[in-house]
Curated annotation (Swiss-Prot):
Name of the encoding gene: rpsL
Biased amino acid composition, Basic residues: 113-126
Highest classification ranks of the organism: Bacteria, Pseudomonadati, Pseudomonadota, Betaproteobacteria, Burkholderiales
Complex and partners: Part of the 30S ribosomal subunit. Contacts proteins S8 and S17. May interact with IF1 in the 30S initiation complex.
GO MF assignments: rRNA binding; structural constituent of ribosome; tRNA binding
InterPro entries assigned: NA-bd_OB-fold, Ribosomal_uS12, Ribosomal_uS12_bac
Primary role: With S4 and S5 plays an important role in translational accuracy. Interacts with and stabilizes bases of the 16S rRNA that are involved in tRNA selection in the A site and with the mRNA backbone. Located at the interface of the 30S and 50S subunits, it traverses the body of the 30S subunit contacting proteins on the other side and probably holding the rRNA structure together. The combined cluster of proteins S8, S12 and S17 appears to hold together the shoulder and platform of the 30S subunit.
Keywords in alphabetical order: Methylation, Ribonucleoprotein, Ribosomal protein, RNA-binding, rRNA-binding, tRNA-binding
Name of protein: Small ribosomal subunit protein uS12
Family listed: Belongs to the universal ribosomal protein uS12 family.
Region described as Disordered: 1-28, 103-126
Organism annotation: Paraburkholderia phytofirmans (strain DSM 17436 / LMG 22146 / PsJN)
Length: 126
């Protein structure tokens, strides 16, 4: 334990919190170009083919981003928007695609939670 004199001389050092999405550099979203679009398998108790993309951002970072929703139109050289948010069962995936912006289309026939998937409201007649 420090003495009063040591505290007067040095003071306490506050712990700095590390960013969970460093590639965004304190921005809400970042634009990037897909360099590879592929599927990968999740960690142990789960089983699926999760859609992910390797994206080169405008600030030079290269990150892996998750493509949420059923079906997508992304391929190499697609321009996409990335937001923070990890996928718990995919190691190294710390970002999500923003559906319905730039080259990423919204999810087709989506009825609920539409804003998260860039889906427009269905016509009243249908």
């Amino acid at each position: 334990m420090p003495t009063i004199n040591q505290l007067v001389r040095k003071g306490r050092q506050s712990e700095t919190t590390k960013s969970k999405s460093p590639a965004l550099q304190d921005c809400p979203q970042r634009r990037g170009v897909c360099t590879r679009v592929y599927t990968t398998t999740p960690k142990k108790p789960n089983s699926a083919l999760r859609k992910v993309a390797k994206v080169r951002l405008t600030n030079g970072f290269e990150v892996i981003s998750y493509i949420g929703g059923e079906g997508h139109n992304l391929q190499e050289h697609s321009v996409v928007l990335i937001r923070g948010g990890r996928v718990k069962d995919l190691p190294g995936v710390r970002y999500h695609m923003v559906r319905g912006s730039l080259d990423t289309q919204g999810v087709k026939d989506r009825k609920q939670a539409r804003s998260k998937y860039g889906a427009k409201r269905a016509k009243a007649g249908k």
